[in-house]
């Protein structure tokens, strides 16, 4: 048996016995052992494969710039991040903006506002739309990242990536959604147009909040692997796949309001399948990055 055929046999075997991704995990571990992390290779890996949960926070921190590439500086940098976290926390406590009763995601929001120079004069002021986005993302991140210091920094840098790197791309996603839905199921798109629903779909939930509060975190983190590593376009294919999955239900609804309400509260039990199919769709239309571990 040649090396290639042995590798293929192992991959098929691993998949059949429930160990899909064993070789991918080994490849990632090799990448993470480098003295200097190769950010480009980590991006490529994250685009191509789901990250093992035990390495997700580390990879996200590297890709979001929270950690520098050099391993020997990681503990020093995270000690600095931790000190900064506690300094901001202390400042907010002193001015009585937060207390022990403040929900953790709201604490992260106030920290972010203080760092950004956007802390309102009173905690009772209504939240701005951008604050609601941060809050939704931070709530989802809490379920994915155990350590509170990591959770704050990842939430903060994830949102900054949306606001900076993806600032021009995000407004284009509704149009791309329409384009790809038309390619996958033109009849379904026609139904949405007939109901005048296309402009009223929950685009903010999908493309601003990146499905936080829509999909369970266990499924959502596989989508965010792609967002963190450089592709906000994956969000389009998750939206398309949601429509395809619930086509029968959506086709039976005859008003924009009913369609939107349903899509804002989709059943959770199909989420893993939706995300897997969405990633396949994304690879089908956008290609698969070449893995170069």
Curated annotation (Swiss-Prot):
Component of the TSC-TBC complex (also named Rhebulator complex), composed of 2 molecules of TSC1, 2 molecules of TSC2 and 1 molecule of TBC1D7. Interacts with TSC1 (via C-terminal half of the coiled-coil domain). GO terms for biological process: activation of GTPase activity; cellular response to starvation; negative regulation of cilium assembly; negative regulation of TOR signaling; negative regulation of TORC1 signaling; positive regulation of protein ubiquitination; response to growth factor. Gene3D superfamilies: Ypt/Rab-GAP domain of gyp1p, domain 1 (1.10.10.750), Ypt/Rab-GAP domain of gyp1p, domain 2 (1.10.8.680), Ypt/Rab-GAP domain of gyp1p, domain 3 (1.10.472.80). This is TBC1 domain family member 7. Pfam families: RabGAP-TBC (PF00566). Keywords: Cytoplasm, Cytoplasmic vesicle, GTPase activation, Lysosome, Membrane. Its main location: membrane. InterPro entries: Rab-GAP-TBC_dom, Rab-GAP_TBC_sf, TBC1D7, TBC1D7_dom2. It comes from Mus musculus (Mouse). PROSITE patterns: TBC_RABGAP (PS50086). It is found in: Lysosome membrane; Cytoplasmic vesicle; Cytoplasm, Cytosol. Residues 50-231 form the Rab-GAP TBC domain. The lineage of its organism: Eukaryota, Metazoa, Chordata, Craniata, Vertebrata. GO terms for molecular function: GTPase activator activity; small GTPase binding. Non-catalytic component of the TSC-TBC complex, a multiprotein complex that acts as a negative regulator of the canonical mTORC1 complex, an evolutionarily conserved central nutrient sensor that stimulates anabolic reactions and macromolecule biosynthesis to promote cellular biomass generation and growth. The TSC-TBC complex acts as a GTPase-activating protein (GAP) for the small GTPase RHEB, a direct activator of the protein kinase activity of mTORC1. The keyword Lipid metabolism does not apply. One of its GO terms (cellular component) is TSC1-TSC2 complex.
